[in-house]
Regions:
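A composition-driven surface/loop motif
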Residues: 2-141
Length: 141
């Protein structure tokens, strides 16, 4: 859903879609062209500030980080039995991380509306792939 405004458009999408738009804008950040670059910078700022709380929520706990590093020893040694035992011993921390990631995924699936700068089709980079365009199409006119 797009409503034209003075600044740009109100774009309604899931937070996951906004994350993909943000990633695509960053992938194309070095593209030449002032109009496109301006839209990239402005839209990236708006989307990043909107997604920051989700990113913060996704950060693993210190306990999980330490376990993850220790688990790498079992993985590198290809010690499946040892890894399984290790995971069982620390199931509380692992379950907490799974719960945390479920909450993050739930947040990413929520719908939001952001005011973004429209990118005129004439200002799109020549080397933009179909996949990248598909991601950005909500902000292209």
């Amino acid at each position: 859903m797009i409503n034209a405004e003075k600044y740009g458009v109100h774009v309604t999408a899931t937070n996951r879609e906004f994350l993909n738009i943000f990633k695509t804008l960053n992938e194309t950040r070095s593209t030449k062209g002032v109009a496109y670059a301006k839209a990239v910078v402005k839209n990236s700022e708006v989307i990043k500030s909107h997604l920051d709380p989700i990113e913060e929520k996704a950060k693993p706990s210190e306990a999980f980080m330490l376990l993850s590093m220790e688990a790498q020893k079992y993985i590198q040694a290809e010690d499946g039995e040892g890894l399984k035992k290790f995971e069982e011993e620390h199931s509380d921390v692992i379950e907490e991380r799974k719960k945390q990631m479920d909450e993050v995924n739930s947040m990413l699936d929520q719908t939001s509306t952001l005011e973004l700068k429209v990118i005129n089709e004439a200002h799109l980079p020549e080397d933009l792939s179909a996949e990248q365009l598909e991601t950005l199409i909500k902000i292209v006119n």
